[in-house]
Amino acid sequence: MYVVVNYTRRLQTLAFNLGSSCYHQGVTGASITSQDRKSKQNFSCCRWTHLITLVHQYSTRISNSKVPRVATWEPVLENQLPPPCQIPVDLVDKLERLALVDFRNQEGLACLEKAIRFADQLHVVDTDGVDPMDSVLEERALYLREDAVAEGDCAEELLQLSKNTVEEYFVAPPGNIPLPKREERAAMLKHSEF
């Protein structure tokens, strides 16, 4: 696309430069009279103008018809979606631990269920003949720089900066949200207001 547009701009520049000489001789790019056709310079100038118009028309069109020009959205009917799922308490506890998100009330659970229901629309998308993408970089060779040590042995100094270490490894601190026990959580959900 860039090559065609760049070529089109060069042709437009050339036609602009030639067009001024044609204009002074009484020829425009829109019409050619029989008298002007006798002059080869004027006729070639008008041919360039016509060629530029054609190239510009074809270069501004989108060449890939698979990609729509405007985003499209079709509503998905409820009967096309899989049945709604109820999230078990064990899964909610695990999600809270992994994502550090607090679902301590009925409103948080309802928001999570709505998000899952919205994502269920992906089941309707036709993916026949589409290979799953394993990695974004699956077609590229990754060139890594040499692993050269820039400074001296500083592993001991870095490990002293951490509060918790096991052997030669940092220990990640637990989540910043204190999670209640399962019994406390069930009691909170029963007494929470929606």
From Swiss-Prot:
Keywords: ATP-binding, Ligase, Mitochondrion, Nucleotide-binding, Protein biosynthesis. It catalyses: L-glutamyl-tRNA(Gln) + L-glutamine + ATP + H2O = L-glutaminyl-tRNA(Gln) + L-glutamate + ADP + phosphate + H(+). It comes from the Eukaryota. It holds the Pfam family GatC. GO terms for molecular function: ATP binding; glutaminyl-tRNA synthase (glutamine-hydrolyzing) activity. One of its GO terms (cellular component) is glutamyl-tRNA(Gln) amidotransferase complex. Its EC number is 6.3.5.-. One of its GO terms (biological process) is mitochondrial translation. InterPro entries: Asp/Glu-ADT_sf_sub_c, GatC. It is found in: Mitochondrion. Transmembrane segments: none annotated. NCBIfam families: gatC (TIGR00135). This protein may be expected to contain an N-terminal transit peptide but none has been predicted. Subunit of the heterotrimeric GatCAB amidotransferase (AdT) complex, composed of A (qrsl1), B (gatb) and C (gatc) subunits. Allows the formation of correctly charged Gln-tRNA(Gln) through the transamidation of misacylated Glu-tRNA(Gln) in the mitochondria. The reaction takes place in the presence of glutamine and ATP through an activated gamma-phospho-Glu-tRNA(Gln). HAMAP family: GatC. Belongs to the GatC family. This is Glutamyl-tRNA(Gln) amidotransferase subunit C, mitochondrial. It comes from Salmo salar.
